[in-house]
Structure formats: structure tokens, C-alpha cells
Amino acid sequence: MKKTLSLLLLLTLILIPARAADVQDVKPTKNVILFISDGTSLATVSTARWLQWYSHPDKPNLNIDPYICGTVRTHSSNAPIGDSAPTTSCYVSGQPSQTGFVSTYPVNCGNDDIYPTDPNRAYQPTMTLLEAVKMFKGGSTGLVFTCEFPHATPADCSAHSYNRGKYEWIAPQMVHNNLDVVIGGGVSILSDDMEKYLKDNGYSVYRNDLKGMRADTNNKMWALYADREMSYDLDRNPDEQPSLEEMTKKAIEKLSKNDKGFFLMVEGSKVDWAAHANDPVGMATDFLAFDRAVGAALEFAKQNGETTVIVTADHGNSGISIGRESCKGYDKLTKDQLFKNLSQFKLTAEGFAKKVNTIPNSEVQSLFREQAGFELTKEELDALNNCKDYKFSPIPEAERHEKSQASMYSNSLSGLMSQIITSRTCMGFTTHGHTGEEVFLASYHPQGDRPMGMHTNIELNHYMCSLYGFEPSFLSDMSNKYFARHTDVFQDYTCEIIPAKEGEVAPTLIVKNKKDKKKQLTIHAFTNVVKAGKKADQDIILNSVVVYVDKNNTFYLPESLVDFLK
């Protein structure tokens, strides 16, 4: 018996080479791929796994399953329930922050702060791991996602703002931050000037051009799809938009050509969006699309031998549960009763909403028969016809009822579709917002140096830093060096802030050397280009972006810029 147990233990150790990774002992790898499934509670992962197993009996496991190694306590600097902006910011910068802050140091909130904060650093940009890999390792960097490109998670890796909604500040930073590969949504946000800058600097740029992206051989590429966010995977037209798996493979193909290594962040963006909508179909199917992308990265990592893959979520969302009060006899419910209806939906709530608004009212029932396996009830039809967003209602808009969502009436067509979907399942929800539980953590390291157990968001950042040989304090130290206040950097020179002109998104900083009038800097915010000389006719190209914060009327920029005035 002892010999049998010993043999089983030995086999376990051989099959699962893993140990709790002390930051000091982690063996660095040349490449890191960070996967973030936005707004994904553990029950979302379970739902996706069950749905896959029910639909494909030969696939009981997800790609992440052999690599699940713990959980992450993720939160804001001043609140246990996190917003997407500060949560991923902490993963990539090591600094917890607060709602809306994109890789930006938080404002001190006194006793509400979970960790101590320095009030003197409020609003300072915090350097990200992506920026550090590019600047100090010479590595390539990339972002893959299905939201629009300046949205919180991709922005967290490559831009800085105290307001995640300020796309006019965030988008130009991402364009000027020397990213090698960007694939995702947001065609309408990339201006002609931004596209020109990219092309002038050697990038291939594709807008809704799937064939172009597939054929591209340039190592520097932006490929964007849809005006804003891309479609849910279940709703996606494969002739128009690539899957997250294909985008991930394309990014790896390009980034891996750099012998100095790379950093890639891949986000399953719309798992979170479906969770906000309480749409279990969108949540589960988009997570499965995310898991397929993880599978592609794991395959590369195993063949490459120099790549770490980390998979997690930035926070929970919706309080989703498998089982709810209306499904009586929960412990007697069969897998058919729990998952058959869920498996029959061929569109997400958003997909149904869009489709319903393109067909006559008389064809609605046939749509649901074909795409969901049931017809709407009289109450559901009544709710649809009274929905403000429904274009083909026989009821004039002014005469439509305004009743609460609880009674199945909603001004949002997508929201109504979510209610209809959920009512056919045994999935439960507690909220349309984020939740504060720990999230799952999975990882692959070629030597088995994985973070085991429960880790904080800060510890996860330190682990990733160690993979590149960076000390835990490195990003904070570099934040002070490359995002210093202009008043400190140019304290011996004359500074004038020129208000933004019409069409400009931020003021301009003019810095003069009073003793030598030829030495002058013209500094525009949110770019990496500084103009030198009295006529501003010389370009200084930075390897970081300049950030302006209106809250304190301050430009944050590299300390070394002062050398051009001496």
C-alpha cells in the first residue's frame, strides 16, 4: 500500500511540475503572455465548463484547467470591489488605484485606503510592465482585445489617465507608445491623424480588413474591427471579424520574431459586458472563446520553452450562480434541466436585440424558434412591443408603457433579451455590477515556477516583474524617473502653459532657457514627440509618452528632458 501511494505521489509530481513561486527564486522567461477575462467570477468559469461539456461530451475540461493554481485578491486602492481600470492597472503597474484611474496613482482617501498612499503622488502616471519591457528590455509589445482599443483594460497597459472615459486623452497615448501589435475594436476612434502617424512610423494599419490582417507580414501592425466594440463570439460573422484565438495567434506570430522577447496582453473583454447585462449565454460563450485563445498561447509556450502564460480575471461581476430559487429541487435537477436550454441559444442577448430590430414584427416568433428553440410568451411579446428600443413595434412609441424591469418591461431591448434568456435557464444573478470575491488564477511556466495559492494583485505584478528580472520596486522607481512633474524637472527654467486651441485636447507646455534663447522645448501632451528649438523645428522622440493632468495643471515627463535645455 505504501509503495502504491509513493508511486502515485511520484506520478503526480512528474505530471504537474509546479511549486509555490517565491519572487526571488523565479526563473526569468523571455516572453510573458497575460490573459485577462474581464469581469469573470468563478461561477462564470464553471458555467462555461459545464456548457462545453454538455454540448461536447468529449470535452469535459477547459484549456486552463490543468494550470489553475490559485486565486487573486483583486480590488481598488480604496474599495474591496474593483473597477476594471484600477484592477488591471495594479496587475501591470503594481500600484492599486481607484475607480476610473488608468495606470495612475490614486488620490489619498484617508481611512478608506486599503493600502497606504502618498498624497504627494496623486495623479502621477504609473509605469506599466508593458512600457518597461519595451523601454528596458528592447522587447516587442502587443495588445489583443474585443472592446474598443482605449477601453479600460488595454488602456491600462499602455496609457495613463484619471478618467477612463477620456478616450481623447487615452487613444493618442496608445498610438504614440510604440506598441508593436494592436488587434481589437475601435475603428471609429482611430483618427486620420493617428493612422497617418502609425503609417509614417512603419506600421500596417487595417480597418475592418480581415484578409489584409491575415496576409500581413509586417512586424508592426494595428488591425481594428467594428466602429467600437467587436461582436460577441457567438454573434460574430467569421467573414468579417476574427476570433480572439486567431487574433492571439497573429499577435504571437509577429511578436515572437523579436529575439529580445515580448509582452502580450490578451483580454476577453465582453465576458464583463455580458455579465453586466446578466446574459448567461454571452458570458459562457465568450469565456469559451477566451479559453480557446489561451489554448493557442499554451501550445506556443510549450513549443517555445521561453514563455510564461498567466490567466486571470480583473474582478468578478453579476453574482452569477448555477441554480436559483425558482428552480425547485436544486439537488435533483439533471444536467438537461440545468444546461439544455442554455446550449440551444444561437445568439447572445445583444445578438437577439440586433436581429429583432432588423425583421418585421410578424417574424419574431420564428426567429426565437430557430435561434433558441422556443416561442415568446404573451407577456414577453407584450414587453417587447412596449420596449422603447424596439423599432418594429405595432404600438406607437408615445403609447408604450414604462414599467419596471422586474415585471419584464425594459426600455433597453438588449436588457429585455437578457431577461428572456435567463428566464429559460436556472442561472441566477445578484447584481448588474461588479463583485468583490477573489478571481481564478492559472499559469504555465516552462520550469514550473508558478504562483500557487491565494495572491494579492500586487503580488501578481511582482511575480510578472520577476519573470523579466525586474525588482518589485522597479516600476515605481521608473515612474518617478519617466513621469516626473514638469515643475520639478524644469524648476530652473521658464515654463508657460498655453491653453488648448480649438480642436486640441490639451494645452501645450513651452519651456525656455532665459540665458540661451535658442534652447526651447515645445511639449504637447499625450504623445512621445517633443519639439526643440525656438522655431520648434527639431523633433525629440521619447520612448515614453508625456501625460497632462488638468486636475493639478501638470505635465508628467522624463527627467532627462532638461538636458536639452542645458
Predicted regions span which residues?
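Extracytoplasmic mature domains of secreted/periplasmic and thylakoid-lumen proteins
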Residues: 95-179, 186
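Cleaved targeting-peptide boundary
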Residues: 21-27
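A post-motif C-terminal structural segment
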Residues: 29-31, 40-46, 50-93, 98, ...
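Sec/Tat signal peptide C-region and signal peptidase I cleavage site
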Residues: 16-20
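Structural beta-sheet core signal
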Residues: 34-35, 143, 311
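Positively charged n-region of N-terminal signal peptides that target proteins for export
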Residues: 1-4
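Bacterial N-terminal signal peptides
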Residues: 8-14
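Active-site-adjacent structural elements in enzyme catalytic domains
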Residues: 27-39, 43-44, 49-52, 121-136
